Amino acid sequence: MAKTRLYLVRHGKTMFNTIGRAQGWSDTPLNEVGERGIHELGIGLREAGLEFKLARSSDSGRTIQTMGIILEELGLTGQIPYTFDKRIREWCFGSFDGGYDGELFMGVMPRVFNIEHVHQLSYAELAEGLVEVDTAGWAENWEKLSGRIWEGFSAIAEELEAAGGGNALVVSHGMTIGTFVYLINRTRPHGLDNGSVTVVDYEDGKFTVACVGDMSYREAGAKVMEEEVETR
């Protein structure tokens, strides 16, 4: 049986990413820079000769748009199974969805916990803090949030393993991917870039993290695109 490996991609840069707004379950499309970055990623994955058996994304528009670009660059549009899973959505920021990042992460949360920076909080503390300050009642507590993220990625790995292993291409979100890594090895990655790749292996019911936030595929794709422009 082939190794079961998940390639977890953070979606391309969006309008809200660009102006510093918390996206969560709200959604904006990739902008021009974001689209180019994902074309770079798709080319980089193609140049690396990676083969994918299935594709999965959250049901958010920005991950669906990202996946479409990657599959196009890989020549896999309509060629491998691709479905959506709401369990691998981003965290829900409740009444702060669509608000400025600075207001939530550098204002409200530090005041609630009497800390200087939100990175001082564990994911569990951050989730419970969001529940506390969310006036809409939409934010998920840590048990619910971590449970649906674990279940979502586990379902992909189990499906792939049952099919004989191989690689899955998965497009999700920065904090969701970071949370999954934390649940595996209790390390907390910071600032996963748009279009970065985090690789997770699955064997005998256990996950191991092979790499986090790898930008080498995007960088390789960017080089190919630059060379194509120079030769025109």
PLM feature spans:
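An N-terminal RHG(E/S)-centered segment typical of histidine phosphatases
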Residues: 1-52, 65-72, 76, 206-215, ...
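Acidic, low-complexity terminal tails and accessory targeting/binding regions
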Residues: 2-4, 91-103, 107-113, 158-166, ...
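Beta-strand elements within well-structured catalytic alpha/beta cores of enzymes
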Residues: 5-9, 56, 163-172
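Active-site glycine-centered loops adjacent to acidic/histidine catalytic or metal-binding residues
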Residues: 11, 87, 173
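Phosphate-coordination/substrate-recognition cap region in phosphate-metabolizing enzymes
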Residues: 42-117
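Short glycine/proline- and acidic residue-enriched helix-loop micro-motifs
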Residues: 110-144
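A mid-sequence, solvent-exposed acidic-amphipathic segment
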Residues: 135-164
